[in-house]
């Protein structure tokens, strides 16, 4: 017999069991696609400006080197500010910026203090401009650095005491697009596409790997690393890409070899799931048995009391109103009286 007061609890436990089954199957099912991607910017790039503070501008030219050249890496799509030697503007005669870009004619931007004139020659890129008016600030800015801005920039300052130069070998850095996918026969392919400079790819654990580089006309490089693992106990591999703009790590699960023995770890979720299901089912069964047993026992004990209470009025009524009971009583009374009379006569 079903126990109505247990229905809600049993339904709730069954729903919980189904939910646990679905979760365990989802967790145990192997996934051949990319599992995780992490990115960490751990390379200290040069700031967008190498300019000195105004307080550091000196009038003592002996402390300023006549010519300085600096290699400066700048990340693409950022802004960059290039500075002239730290010399006060009131001591200047002419300021000239020479810009030499790859595949383009040399560009010259000049300012003459005496006439307050500016002049440009072969300068077509509108993103390369003075920071402000050249009579107030001699710095040069590049808005939204692109690959085409890779080149050499030099500031020439002419003073009564001589000429001072500061040059920049500007190296534009391009972050590669990293992908990882699995080929057949436990082979994984990791690619760092269109990076500048070329990225470096390494694997964990190490396998039988081959790396190729493809160079593009814009100066970027695509690096492709193909790696194979013969060892069957290697289930997860990690591709680590190192680059000046930051490092990235991707990992993927390899497909098991057909017929190969599965690792014991793969069965742990199913074992745990089986134990949980058996525990819940056993608990439900005990609740059902104990509840129904108590229900039947209470019903059995209450039934005789009700029948006895119901029969007593009926029996009394029958005994009082049935003529058969009256006749019997009269006969018994007559026999008793006759017995008393006989006893008295015998005594006399």
From Swiss-Prot:
CD200 and CD200R1 interact via their respective N-terminal Ig-like domains. Interacts with Human herpesvirus 8 vOX2 protein. Inhibitory receptor for the CD200/OX2 cell surface glycoprotein. Limits inflammation by inhibiting the expression of pro-inflammatory molecules including TNF-alpha, interferons, and inducible nitric oxide synthase (iNOS) in response to selected stimuli. Also binds to HHV-8 K14 viral CD200 homolog with identical affinity and kinetics as the host CD200. InterPro entries: CD200R, CD80_C2-set, Ig-like_dom, Ig-like_dom_sf, Ig-like_fold. This is Cell surface glycoprotein CD200 receptor 1. The chain crosses the membrane at residues 266-286. Residues 160-251 form the Ig-like C2-type domain. GO terms for molecular function: glycosylated region protein binding; immunoglobulin receptor activity; signaling receptor activity. Belongs to the CD200R family. Disulfide bonds join 83-155, 107-123, 190-239, 209-227.
